[in-house]
Amino acid sequence: MCTSVIYTAGDYYFGRNLDLEVNLGQEVVITPRNKTLEFREMPNLEHHYAIIGMSIVRDDYPLYFDGVNEKGVGMAGLNFDGPAHYFPVQEGKDNIASFELVPYILATASSVAEAKKLLSNANIANINFSDKLQAAPDRKSTRLNSSH
């Protein structure tokens, strides 16, 4: 399980750890402002804020664990015990894969209010990065597999 902490004393401080027993090749990664970000079910993002964070890079795509953008908006993708839940792609929603969530929010939100607005129309779609890098198990598939 990952842990994050926010400390406020006039300013905001954010930190997190990666409770991992293995090294996945994570490193500090910078996505420069306006470097094209590709999404599976949404248009490419050509114009956006710069991002810095902990990530692994696969196929020239930053798989961010956490980060902060040039406007000071920060977030982390935390791992919680138990299965996740994803949704089918939905018309009229911002269909985002779980691995796209951190760069999507940080690339486009200049405030927490903007991040909340983006999240209100977000649909975390059931999309794997690749056959080798799959999303956390969906609770439906976990239930089905545990009943056998």
Where are these regions (language model features)?
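Generic beta-strand structural signal
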Residues: 71-73, 102, 137-140
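Conserved small/polar residues in nucleotide/adenosyl-binding loops
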Residues: 142-148
